[in-house]
UniProtKB/Swiss-Prot annotation:
Protein name: CBY1-interacting BAR domain-containing protein 2
BAR-like: region residues: 6-217
Record remark on domains: The BAR-like domain displays limited similarity to other BAR domains.
Source organism of the structure: Homo sapiens (Human)
GO cellular component, one term: ciliary transition zone
Subunit structure, as described in the record: Homodimer (via BAR-like domain). Heterodimer (via BAR-like domain) with FAM92A. Interacts with CBY1.
Family: Belongs to the CIBAR family.
Keyword annotations of the record: Cell projection, Cilium biogenesis/degradation, Cytoplasm, Cytoskeleton
UniProt note on tissues of expression: Restricted to certain tissues, most prominently expressed in multicilaited tissues.
Any matching Pfam family: FAM92
PANTHER family in the record: CBY1-INTERACTING BAR DOMAIN-CONTAINING PROTEIN 2, CBY1-INTERACTING BAR DOMAIN-CONTAINING PROTEIN HOMOLOG
GO biological process: cilium assembly
Entry keyword annotation includes Flavoprotein: no
S-S bonds: none
Underlying gene: CIBAR2
Length: 304
């Protein structure tokens, strides 16, 4: 009977091992599956962010548009790596943990089989004890009962050895798989984050190089209704440049007016040769006028 009780304690240890594995591996599977799903949802949200960044960039000034598009492209690359992360987690971590349930079920079946053999041995021992108490002189019946007990003990011993091998193999495989699952998990995470850091570094540089002053100039120009940048200060020259004089000569009209003004001191635009050229921005285009004591005289073809 002591051997039977010893085997019973052994079985309880085996059952606890399997039950503990079933409990925690089930929780690992559930949590890692949830982790993978949340990672996939994070990828989806980031894809939406990429789309919004592109839409926003298309509505902005050129400098910001180029920066936002570059940033969106880098963010999209990170999501490609995240997609690979999700697929690898499912393949190398979650799915193997799901399949572990079948192995646990098989080990439980082996333990159940052993317990059946053990119970049979215990019953034969109990019958033998009762027979010895009721009919101590019936040696034939007692001998047959002892034979049955011996057979049950042999079956129980053989089954015990098989079960020990099964549970030992189960424990070894469990520890090996546990190591592999989490090594794969960490490797997948390291690969993703290494790639992500590389791409995010590029994204940071893209954002850091953004020249907001150029966009501010464009914005201020739009606020003033101007679609370019022109120098609105008076030119330093006291006489028109050759290109302007050539234009004046081709038109002819202003040249005559200037000549008359110089000949006639009473002419309203006479300034005795002291003329300066002003540059104005009119309706989005540069226009020139000659400035003197008499006021402003616009070039032909231009009007304020």
């Amino acid at each position: 009977m002591n051997i039977v009780f010893s085997r019973d304690s052994q079985v309880r240890v085996m059952e606890n091992t399997v039950a503990n594995t079933e409990k925690y591996f089930g929780q690992f599977c559930s949590l890692l599956a949830a982790y993978t799903r949340k990672t996939a949802r994070l990828r989806d949200k980031a894809d939406q962010l990429v789309k919004q960044l592109i839409d926003f960039a298309n509505s902005e000034n050129p400098e910001l548009r180029a920066t936002m598009r570059g940033f969106a492209e880098d963010l999209a690359k990170v999501q490609d790596y995240r997609q690979a992360q999700v697929e690898r987690l499912e393949t190398k971590v979650v799915n193997p943990l799901k399949l572990y349930g079948a192995q646990i079920k098989q080990t439980r079946a082996e333990i159940k089989k052993f317990k059946h053999v053990q119970n049979h041995e215990i019953k034969q021992l109990e019958k033998l004890e009762k027979l010895r108490q009721k009919s101590p002189s019936d040696q034939q019946m007692i001998g047959q009962a002892e034979t049955r007990v011996q057979r049950a003990a042999v079956d129980s011993s053989r089954t015990t050895l098989q079960l020990e091998e099964t549970v030992d193999g189960f424990q070894r495989q469990k520890l090996k798989d546990l190591q592999k699952f989490f090594c794969d998990f960490v490797t997948i995470e390291m690969v993703f984050h290494a790639k992500a850091v590389e791409v995010y570094s590029s994204a940071f540089q893209t954002l850091e190089k953004y020249d907001l002053e150029r966009d501010l100039l464009d914005f201020r120009a739009k606020m003033q209704g101007v679609y370019g940048h022109y120098d609105t200060r008076l030119l330093a020259n006291t006489s028109p440049p050759p290109s302007v004089l050539q234009s004046l000569a081709s038109q002819g009209t202003l040249q005559v007016q200037l000549s008359r003004a110089n000949e006639d001191p009473e002419h309203p635009h006479a300034n005795h040769g002291r003329f300066s050229l002003c540059e104005w921005v009119v309706k989005g285009q540069p226009a020139h006028c000659v400035c003197g004591q008499g006021g402003h005289l616009m070039l032909p073809g231009h009007s304020l």
